[in-house]
Amino acid sequence: MHFKLLVVFVDDRKTEALMKAARDSGATGCTVINHARGEGAKKQTSFFGMALAAPLDVLLMIVEQHLSRRILEHLRDVGEFDTKPGTGVAFQLDVEDAVGVVRQAEKLAVAVEKEI
């Protein structure tokens, strides 16, 4: 079984909705890193040197490769990444090797068989 790592940067107000969307699309879990900061193409506004941007969360999900595109597209739709500027970014990376995912792999085996 081969995996992808989905990485999502999103306004913290959308985290719960995106976690639900990922699970509904086949993800078996998610790790959330709170209070991330960043800057996009447009420089953020500041007030006396302090950024006024909303806090971001980083969502990390290891998913089976055959399910990754469907999950990524569902995240895009729920998060409105392509329709509203500045709402978030999601991408996937290849996972060369992983340990500690035996339970997820067992659950995913049935879902992947249906998918392919």
Predicted regions and their residues:
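Positively charged, small/polar-rich N-terminal and surface patches that mediate targeting and assembly
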Residues: 1-116
